[in-house]
């Protein structure tokens, strides 16, 4: 009997994620049943601290991030460890904090995060823009710089979150790279090229 058939049901194996040292991913992790994973300002701050710990532990680089009320987006560059180890550390540590604070039982996040391997330079830039425009698309703010819980303010030098790696992104733009990147993101004529359905499970 086929090992994938158990009790008359077919067990479908999950496709392994493509990975290699230095691989860059667009990652999206959502709260289970689209429930809130951030309820107040402290939650966002704690998540950022846990993100810092995970980045340091697995020597990853974050090129862009955005924390929405019920999901997160990351543009992440790996090092010598497969992406799953980083995501496990990040999600489990935050879930422990959240469940303890709110006396919540059960899973906080959907069982499997979504990911898309970013290989082309153009897709890297589109993904960075897409992530930073999430709060605008959701009509939370008019301008991406007005949203506190993303890396955009750091990218355009309004603050330094000591997390975001700006150099790779800004290197695509020559003179006045910060201004040119800002124009690239906030260009009202652009379209949201990167769509959520393109982020594979």
Where are these regions (language model features)?
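Short Pro-Cys-Gly-centered "Cys-loop" motif that presents a nucleophilic cysteine in a tight turn
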Residues: 1-64, 68, 77-201
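Short acidic-rich active-site patches of cyclic nucleotide enzymes
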Residues: 71
């Amino acid at each position: 009997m086929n090992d994938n058939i158990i009790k008359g049901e077919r067990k479908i194996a999950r496709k392994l994620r493509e990975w290699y040292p230095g691989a860059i991913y667009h990652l999206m992790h959502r709260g289970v049943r689209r429930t809130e994973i951030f309820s107040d300002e402290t939650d966002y701050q704690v998540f950022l601290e846990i993100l810092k710990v995970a980045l340091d532990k697995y020597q990853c680089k974050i090129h862009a991030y955005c924390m929405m009320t019920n999901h997160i987006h990351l543009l992440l560059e790996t090092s010598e460890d497969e992406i799953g180890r980083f995501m496990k550390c990040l999600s489990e540590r935050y879930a422990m904090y959240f469940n303890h604070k709110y006396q919540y039982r059960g899973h906080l996040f959907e069982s499997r995060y979504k990911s898309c391997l970013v290989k082309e330079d153009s897709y890297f830039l589109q993904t960075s823009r897409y992530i930073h425009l999430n709060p605008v698309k959701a009509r939370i703010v008019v301008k991406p710089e007005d949203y506190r819980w993303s890396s955009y303010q750091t990218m355009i030098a309004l603050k330094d979150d000591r997390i975001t790696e700006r150099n790779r992104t800004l290197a695509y733009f020559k003179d006045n790279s910060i201004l040119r990147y800002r124009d690239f993101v906030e260009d009202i004529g652009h379209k949201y090229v990167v769509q959520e359905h393109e982020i594979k499970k």
